[in-house]
């Protein structure tokens, strides 16, 4: 069955605009099967004061949209990778790939049709490939683009999302809700199945372009503007006073960096948050080998 799945994916990608490397996850693992990693389709939330299992330094993805703020603990996302959610009338998918360290929020609709996503069990450049349950198109998380199926070539809209600590997010968004551990799945959310991975130089799966210059797991903030890409390595941001004025493409940006909480976020010249992605350097480079890289000026 897995060999058949691998052959099918080869045929899919052969007709797509994306070259290899693709691969299923470890073939001996249930994660290699579609929905072997179960997405959360009916998320439950708690008020911040009821989230007693979260410690101040725990990592979360924080999203504010349509007047609502929500936190998604990485400890839960490590086991599920996708939360199909809603903010008012807006369908949103919050996604996290532990292999790339990338958390992203997307408007979950294409062609006016709301979508719900699952974990395909397949990877491209070590990054999770999502599938939508309506038409079964395959979507790249980092690329936000459908590589096969009825929506092939379409791209999903990114929504600004923060990757920070629970203490930081709660301090700035005291009205936040928190994704509950009551997911309907039997998982040990106190155990990190990827413990130590973010410190290792090695990758579990192949990538098309191999990054140089920084540790492969160096965290970067990646921004896109007018089809151009720029990475802001945390190692460079740490050399600044915490705020950088820069340009990405034709856009002026302000990047704020908080070393204590490991948080980097960007805003435009009007102070409006910009969608970006925080993730491992190797992953950003694998998708954007032509990326520019911010270098801190000597102080």
Where are these regions (language model features)?
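Bacterial Sec-dependent signal peptides at the C-terminal "C-region" and cleavage site
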Residues: 2-26
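Mid-to-C-terminal functional-domain signal that highlights helix-capping/loop sites
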Residues: 17-299
């Amino acid at each position: 069955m897995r060999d058949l799945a691998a052959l099918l994916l080869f045929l899919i990608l052969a007709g797509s605009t994306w070259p290899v490397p693709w691969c299923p996850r470890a073939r001996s693992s249930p994660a290699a099967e579609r929905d072997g990693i179960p997405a959360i389709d009916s998320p439950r939330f708690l008020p911040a004061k009821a989230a007693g299992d979260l410690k101040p330094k725990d990592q979360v993805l924080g999203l504010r949209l349509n007047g609502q703020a929500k936190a998604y603990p990485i400890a839960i996302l490590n086991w599920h990778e996708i939360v199909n959610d809603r903010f008012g009338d807006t369908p949103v998918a919050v996604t996290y790939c532990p292999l790339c360290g990338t958390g992203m929020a997307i408007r979950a609709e294409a062609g006016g049709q709301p979508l719900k996503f699952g974990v395909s069990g397949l990877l491209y450049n070590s990054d999770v490939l999502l599938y939508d349950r309506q038409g079964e198109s395959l979507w790249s998380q980092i690329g936000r683009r459908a590589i096969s199926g009825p929506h092939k070539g379409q791209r999903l809209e990114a929504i600004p999302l923060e990757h920070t600590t629970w203490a930081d997010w709660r301090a700035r968004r005291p009205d936040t809700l928190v994704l509950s551990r009551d997911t309907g799945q039997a998982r040990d959310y106190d155990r990190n199945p990827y413990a130590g991975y973010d410190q290792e130089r090695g990758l579990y799966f192949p990538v098309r372009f191999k990054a140089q210059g920084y540790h492969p797991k160096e965290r970067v903030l990646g921004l896109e503007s007018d089809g151009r890409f720029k990475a802001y390595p945390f190692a460079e941001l740490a050399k600044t006073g915490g705020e950088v004025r820069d340009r990405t493409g034709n856009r002026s940006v302000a990047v704020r960096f908080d070393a204590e909480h490991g948080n980097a976020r960007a805003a435009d010249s009007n102070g409006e948050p910009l969608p970006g992605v925080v993730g491992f350097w190797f992953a950003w480079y694998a998708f954007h080998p032509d990326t520019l890289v911010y270098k801190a000026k000597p102080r």
